[in-house]
């Protein structure tokens, strides 16, 4: 049998429908692929072989039809998405043995689509980090170069897809945690509009910013995955009651007349020359396809990082109060009294970066500093939203780099939090405004992928996919493969 692990979702679907392969065949090959490459990559925290094989057998018995495009397709799940009977750790010692008794809403949708979860993917602890180096369990490697980070916090989700361990994965994005690792690994990653995908069962980091989204190796696959996981959920108070279009319906390659904005702030100081060049070339590609691309200004972007880290850390300090050593999660044995249970369980259960964010958030919310920090950050957030609204009054989309540079070395920035935080500078404004954003492959610098970020209007992922697909068809970046997937050096 030919190798299946680098095929698209559409190709796999055709093979399954024609009965050239079964869901059991595909799941077995996926599990073998994970086993063969996991030592090199470290993408998975848990592999759920028995459950995956049982599900594959049941799906084969039921039969796979043309009308169910994702039936029998294996999928990897970021380990902050709650999965019944599969350990869910959020990359933390605090939850190292947490076995949930319910599924997140996105998992319900995955099962409704007859997809097959094969395991839980490594991530920065509680999604706090940009390199997947803060995980309690292991350090994930970049699919293109195992001496480089895969990005974060959804590093496992990106590395696994780029290396062909799974054809699709779910990640979460609070300040760039889908788009940045997608860029670093040369794949497609989409953060949907806030409210498009249910957050019920997502272990919260910053509730006003978090959003679940798909990572795939091409645009159409990504649209298929978003079709499956989108929709209103009464269990999530921030879920939006908007209709879900078929995101694959308009992937024609025709974007004549589309108006695209390129903010000058996104190509400024700190952006690597090769990254800047790739974005400018992408702008020329869009022009050649019949779109107009014009320079605009998003003047408050430069305050995005400061506002984001105050808001996100403040929300995290509140959300993480629940991990106290009493109800569930890690409990210290080094205790004499109740106070020791709280203090020692949290001190021993949380890693350095999580503690740093809790401290920053608690400080920002404290009585003497609330107005100067948290309140002011909220006001800056409003200004950033207004900047986007002003541009979107005249344009359909905004483009720019996903990250200022390509992937950096393992260990290079782990002890320099400010440098690490600055890698989010181009992605956090999108979360602050609740907009959809995606990263698609757009070039290379010294053999490492460059990501192009596409930002859309609220609930207009449809137009983003349309433009991304047109760009993909006009270029060949998405066809390039890392060595681990059979590509050339």
UniProtKB/Swiss-Prot annotation:
<dbReference type="InterPro" id="IPR004412">
    <property type="entry name" value="GatA"/>
</dbReference>
<feature type="active site" description="Charge relay system">
    <location>
        <position position="153"/>
    </location>
</feature>
<dbReference type="GO" id="GO:0005524">
    <property type="term" value="F:ATP binding"/>
</dbReference>
<keyword id="KW-0648">Protein biosynthesis</keyword>
<protein>
    <recommendedName>
        <fullName>Glutamyl-tRNA(Gln) amidotransferase subunit A</fullName>
        <ecNumber>6.3.5.7</ecNumber>
    </recommendedName>
</protein>
<dbReference type="InterPro" id="IPR020556">
    <property type="entry name" value="Amidase_CS"/>
</dbReference>
<dbReference type="InterPro" id="IPR023631">
    <property type="entry name" value="Amidase_dom"/>
</dbReference>
<dbReference type="GO" id="GO:0006412">
    <property type="term" value="P:translation"/>
</dbReference>
<feature type="active site" description="Charge relay system">
    <location>
        <position position="78"/>
    </location>
</feature>
<feature type="active site" description="Acyl-ester intermediate">
    <location>
        <position position="177"/>
    </location>
</feature>
<dbReference type="GO" id="GO:0030956">
    <property type="term" value="C:glutamyl-tRNA(Gln) amidotransferase complex"/>
</dbReference>
<dbReference type="InterPro" id="IPR000120">
    <property type="entry name" value="Amidase"/>
</dbReference>
<dbReference type="Pfam" id="PF01425">
    <property type="entry name" value="Amidase"/>
</dbReference>
<keyword id="KW-0067">ATP-binding</keyword>
<keyword id="KW-0547">Nucleotide-binding</keyword>
<comment type="similarity">
    <text>Belongs to the amidase family. GatA subfamily.</text>
</comment>
<comment type="function">
    <text>Allows the formation of correctly charged Gln-tRNA(Gln) through the transamidation of misacylated Glu-tRNA(Gln) in organisms which lack glutaminyl-tRNA synthetase. The reaction takes place in the presence of glutamine and ATP through an activated gamma-phospho-Glu-tRNA(Gln).</text>
</comment>
<dbReference type="InterPro" id="IPR036928">
    <property type="entry name" value="AS_sf"/>
</dbReference>
<keyword id="KW-0436">Ligase</keyword>
<comment type="subunit">
    <text>Heterotrimer of A, B and C subunits.</text>
</comment>
<dbReference type="GO" id="GO:0050567">
    <property type="term" value="F:glutaminyl-tRNA synthase (glutamine-hydrolyzing) activity"/>
</dbReference>
């Amino acid at each position: 049998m030919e190798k299946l692990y680098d095929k698209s979702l559409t190709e796999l679907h055709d093979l399954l429908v024609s009965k050239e392969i079964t869901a059991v065949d595909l799941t077995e090959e996926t599990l073998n692929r994970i086993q063969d490459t996991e030592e090199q990559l470290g993408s998975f925290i848990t592999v759920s072989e028995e459950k995956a094989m049982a599900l594959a057998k049941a799906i084969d018995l039921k039969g796979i039809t043309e009308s169910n495009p994702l039936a029998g397709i294996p999928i990897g799940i970021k380990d902050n998405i709650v999965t019944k009977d599969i350990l869910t750790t959020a990359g933390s010692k605090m939850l190292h043995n947490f076995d949930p008794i319910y599924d997140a809403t996105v998992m319900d949708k995955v099962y409704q689509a007859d997809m097959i979860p094969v395991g839980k993917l490594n991530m920065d602890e509680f999604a706090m980090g940009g390199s997947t180096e803060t995980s309690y369990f292991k350090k994930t490697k970049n699919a293109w170069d195992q001496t480089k980070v895969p990005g974060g916090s959804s590093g496992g989700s990106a590395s696994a897809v780029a290396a062909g361990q799974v054809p699709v994965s779910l990640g979460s994005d609070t300040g760039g945690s889908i788009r940045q690792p997608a860029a670093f690994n040369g794949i497609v990653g989409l953060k949907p509009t806030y409210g498009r995908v249910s957050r019920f069962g997502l272990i919260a980091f910053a509730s006003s910013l978090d959003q679940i989204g798909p990572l795939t190796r091409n645009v159409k696959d990504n649209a298929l995955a978003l079709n499956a996981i989108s929709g209103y959920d009464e269990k999530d108070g921030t879920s939006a009651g908007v209709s879900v279009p078929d995101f694959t319906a308009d992937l024609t390659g025709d974007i004549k007349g589309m108006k695209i904005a390129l903010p000058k702030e996104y190509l400024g100081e700190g952006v690597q020359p090769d990254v800047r060049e790739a974005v400018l070339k992408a702008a020329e590609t869009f022009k050649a396809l019949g779109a107009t691309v014009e320079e605009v200004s998003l003047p408050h972007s430069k305050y995005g990082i400061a506002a984001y880290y105050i808001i996100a850390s403040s929300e995290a300090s509140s959300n993480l109060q629940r991990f106290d050593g009493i109800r569930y999660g890690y409990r210290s044995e080094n205790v004499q009294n109740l106070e020791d249970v709280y203090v020692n369980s949290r001190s021993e259960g949380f890693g350095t970066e999580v503690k740093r964010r809790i401290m920053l958030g608690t400080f920002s919310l404290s009585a003497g500093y609330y107005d100067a920090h948290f309140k002011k950050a909220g006001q800056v957030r409003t200004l950033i939203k207004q900047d986007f609204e002003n541009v979107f009054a005249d344009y359909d989309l905004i483009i720019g780099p996903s990250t200022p540079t390509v992937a950096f070395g393992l260990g290079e920035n782990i002890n320099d939090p400010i440098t690490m935080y600055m890698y989010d500078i181009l992605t956090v404004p999108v979360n602050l405004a609740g907009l959809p954003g995606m990263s698609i492959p757009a070039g290379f610098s010294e053999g490492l992928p460059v990501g192009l970020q596409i930002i859309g209007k609220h609930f207009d992922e449809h137009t983003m996919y349309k433009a991304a697909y047109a760009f993909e068809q006009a270029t060949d970046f998405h066809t390039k493969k890392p060595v681990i997937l059979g590509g050339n050096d």
